[in-house]
Regions:
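Conserved phosphate/anionic-ligand binding catalytic regions in large, soluble enzymes, centered on
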Residues: 22-38
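Terminal, membrane-proximal amphipathic helices
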Residues: 1-26, 43-73, 88-90, 100-153
C-alpha cells in the first residue's frame, strides 16, 4: 500500500531539517573544507527527500538534482551565495572574526539547505502525485521563496 502524501510530506520535512542541521554543523569547520561537506549533505538530503516519495536516487543523482535546483535560481543568486561563503571564509581566517564568519556561514547555509529541501520536496511531491514536472522557472520561484523565508527568520 502506498503511503499517503501527508506521510510523505512529514517524512520529507524531517529529512529537510536533518539536512539543515548537517550544513549548519559544517559552519564550524574551516571554510575551505566545509564546501565539500555542505555539498555532500545537500546531495544526501536530496536523496533522502526523494526516498520519502518512493524515488530511489544514487548520491550522484541527488547531487545532480541539487545542481539543477541551484541553477534554476540564476547566476546572480548563485554568485551572491558564493560571495557570502567567501566573505565567511575571509572572516574566519582572521581568527578575530571566526565566530562572526561561522555565524554568517551557518545562517546562509541553513537558508540554502531549506531552499534546496523545499524545492526537492515540491519536485518529488509533484512526481508522487502524478502531476506534470515543474518547470525551471517554477523550481526557481520555489527556491527563491523558501530561501527568503528562511533567511528572514
Amino acid at each position: 500500500m502506498a503511503k499517503s502524501v501527508y506521510v510523505c510530506d512529514q517524512d520529507a520535512d524531517v529529512a529537510i531539517k536533518t539536512m539543515m542541521a548537517a550544513v549548519v554543523g559544517t559552519a564550524v569547520v574551516p571554510a575551505h573544507v566545509n564546501w565539500a561537506l555542505t555539498a555532500s549533505a545537500m546531495g544526501a538530503g536530496a536523496v533522502a527527500i526523494g526516498k520519502c516519495y518512493g524515488v530511489q536516487l544514487t548520491k550522484d543523482e541527488g547531487w545532480k538534482f541539487v545542481k539543477q535546483f541551484v541553477l534554476s535560481e540564476g547566476m546572480w543568486f548563485l554568485s551572491m551565495n558564493v560571495g557570502s561563503k567567501i566573505l565567511s571564509m575571509l572572516m574566519e581566517s582572521t581568527g578575530f572574526g571566526y565566530a562572526v564568519g561561522a555565524a554568517l556561514d551557518a545562517a546562509t547555509s541553513a537558508a540554502f539547505a531549506w531552499a534546496i529541501g523545499s524545492t526537492a520536496k515540491a519536485y518529488f511531491r509533484n512526481e508522487y502525485l502524478g502531476k506534470s514536472k515543474l518547470t525551471k522557472e517554477e523550481l526557481g520561484e520555489i527556491f527563491r521563496k523558501a530561501f527568503r523565508e528562511q533567511k528572514n527568520k
